[in-house]
Design a protein with these regions (language model features):
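Hydrophobic alpha-helical segments
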Residues: 1-182
Length: 182
């Protein structure tokens, strides 16, 4: 159960908040998950929505990379909602079911393909030590270049922000398959 009242109807908001609610509904198809808490601050919700739109739909990174990164970040941050939501998104983006199981089980980077392991290591170092080693930095930099590395870092930050919101307020509206629950 959520720790604060969740905003599920636009009528619960003042006029400016209703516009943000509508924009979220239009861009995402539904107003759920972190938006149920973020809408207590419509301006924050709107700015978060814009960042998320760039990360998810406009980034120069391959969609599969974005969804895999989101999935690893959600799992490493033990964020039930983002994990559940992105299992489906990752599958649709082409992340293999076995890879999703490895992320779910928090298996070592060596159990992933080389390209997956690079992202797993990068996300885990950022989330757990708040820094990346020189070798991880160089690997990611060599693969994605400056712009791509900035976008990958921002993707991790975006999903960390959502995880903080969801985990703080206990907002969970998505459910993963039974064998992938966290």
């Amino acid at each position: 159960m959520a720790r604060i009242a969740t905003i599920t109807k636009k009528e619960e908001l003042a006029a400016d908040g209703q516009k943000v609610f509508d924009a979220i509904a239009q861009s995402r198809g539904v107003v759920g998950g972190p938006w149920l808490a973020l809408l207590h601050s419509p301006e924050m919700a709107q700015r978060t929505m814009h960042l998320g739109s760039y990360v998810r739909f406009e980034s120069t990174l391959d969609h599969k990379v974005i969804e895999f990164t989101a999935l690893v970040a959600a799992r490493e941050l033990d964020c039930k909602h983002e994990w559940a939501a992105h299992v489906n998104h990752a599958q649709k983006a082409g992340v293999p079911a076995e890879t999703i199981r490895l992320v779910h089980q928090k298996k070592g980077a060596e159990t992933f393909s080389s390209e997956e392991a690079q992202i797993v290591s990068f996300v885990r170092e950022m989330v757990h030590t708040h820094r990346v080693s020189e070798s991880t930095f160089q690997t990611i930099f060599n693969r994605f270049g400056e712009k791509g590395m900035v976008e990958l870092t921002a993707t991790i930050g975006y999903y960390a922000m959502l995880a903080c919101t969801l985990n703080t307020f206990d907002v969970y509206t998505a459910t993963p398959p039974d064998d992938l629950k966290i």
